């Protein structure tokens, strides 16, 4: 659908409705120099001169924005242990000032995308996140059902969605039930290498989905846990799509048609089969995932949204940023950051890893906490309707996850 209602009016055409809207936004704490009021554009934060349209602000604030991979505050490599870990483990470490940064970001649901190298490690991670949410009930809820999305639509709290980036913690099929009961609502089958379920995209040989992997998918879909194929290799991805009987997801992956030759991206065949199952694919905001070389801009990210929309419909595209709140702010050429990059993995060159001139991994313009507004502006530029933008910002994730969890 095309919506040209975003055309900026000139000063003499400012309506009474616009003026009332401007006053409401001012009351919400926006910084609005007088000329910007007349153009219906507003500054969201004092430290930046970036201005956003009234339409973009309305869309973000009127949507439960879901990022299916946003690691909260994990990637500030100059701070060890990561702030996320400190906040989970130290009483009262998360402050009102920290909350304000999250509250004003535009994100409403964080898929925290933890690693699960073992059963015991996954239990510990789940316990820490459950403890964190319980420690700050005035600010956070754990998202595990459709009713939680409905709740977030009416209050200012933020949802924590417990998901893992592999399934190594499932020692037996019954462990799926155990972790569902503890709050886990999504799991990738594999990370980068081969495990008991299938092969990740860095595996030397893609052996496809194993019998055990098929059993895990069946149990996940029975209990209502989302099957995530983000890091799975090609044959494993296609096998899993064939084995699934209900919607599955790709939490964060680019389109191979837009980034040719990138094995971490999904082919059109995969995207079509995902859509036929009713699934959704999250578009990342990391330079080396959306384009094989520099320069990279937000327009390259938008190209992936466009490709999914044109191939299977806007109903199957969402956000899967693969960043933390502040956009993985530290340059990767810092000593601390180099320790966090798993470049010693076999076949790491398949990532086509590269950073910008500033050493940062996040796409410029999407490298800050309020990037949801920049994404909304970009989708407006691409002439999507308000309804379609709302779907891509969060409505699609809300629909598919509610369906999966509602078994």
Which functions belong to the PLM regions below?
Residues 14-205, 260-282, 286-407:
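N-terminal hydrophobic targeting/anchoring segments and the immediately downstream early-domain regions
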Residues 6, 10-11, 33, 63, ...:
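A general, composition-driven signal for non-globular sequence regions
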Residues 11, 219, 244-246, 380-384:
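Secondary-structure boundary/capping motif
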Residues 1-14, 40-41:
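N-terminal secretory signal peptides
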């Amino acid at each position: 659908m095309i919506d040209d209602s975003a055309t900026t009016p000139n000063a003499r055409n400012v309506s009474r409705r616009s003026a009332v809207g401007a006053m409401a936004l001012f009351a919400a704490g926006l910084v609005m120099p007088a000329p910007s009021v007349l153009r219906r554009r507003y500054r969201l934060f004092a430290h930046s001169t970036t201005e956003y349209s009234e339409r973009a602000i309305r869309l973000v604030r009127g949507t439960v924005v879901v990022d299916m991979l946003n690691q909260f505050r994990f990637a500030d490599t100059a701070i060890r242990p990561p702030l996320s870990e400190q906040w989970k483990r130290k009483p009262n470490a998360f402050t009102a000032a920290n909350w304000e940064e999250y509250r004003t970001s535009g994100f409403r649901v964080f898929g925290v995308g933890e690693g699960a190298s073992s059963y015991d490690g996954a239990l510990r991670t789940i316990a820490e996140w459950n403890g964190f949410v319980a420690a700050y009930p005035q600010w956070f809820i754990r998202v595990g059902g459709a009713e939680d999305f409905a709740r977030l639509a009416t209050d200012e709290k933020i949802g924590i969605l417990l998901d893992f980036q592999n399934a190594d913690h499932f020692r037996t099929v019954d462990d799926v039930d155990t972790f569902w009961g503890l709050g886990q609502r999504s799991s990738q089958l594999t990370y980068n290498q081969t495990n008991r379920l299938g092969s990740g995209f860095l595996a030397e040989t893609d052996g496809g989905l194993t019998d055990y992997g098929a059993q895990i998918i069946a149990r996940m879909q029975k209990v209502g846990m989302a099957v995530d194929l983000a890091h799975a290799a090609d044959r494993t991805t296609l096998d899993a799509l064939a084995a699934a009987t209900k919607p599955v997801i790709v939490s964060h992956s680019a389109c191979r048609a837009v980034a040719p030759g990138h094995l971490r991206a999904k082919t059109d065949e995969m995207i079509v089969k995902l859509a036929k199952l009713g699934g959704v694919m999250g578009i990342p905001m990391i330079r080396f995932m959306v384009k094989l070389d520099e320069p990279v801009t937000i327009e390259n990210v938008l190209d992936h949204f466009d490709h999914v929309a044109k191939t299977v419909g806007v109903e199957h595209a969402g956000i899967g940023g693969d960043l933390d709140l502040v956009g993985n702010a530290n340059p990767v050429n810092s000593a601390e950051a180099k320790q966090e990059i798993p470049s010693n993995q076999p076949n790491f060159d398949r990532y086509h890893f590269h950073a910008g001139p500033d050493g940062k991994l996040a796409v410029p313009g999407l490298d800050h906490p309020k990037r949801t507004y920049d994404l909304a502006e970009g989708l407006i530029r691409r002439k999507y309707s308000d309804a379609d933008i709302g779907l891509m910002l969060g409505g699609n994730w809300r629909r598919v996850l509610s369906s999966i969890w509602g078994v």
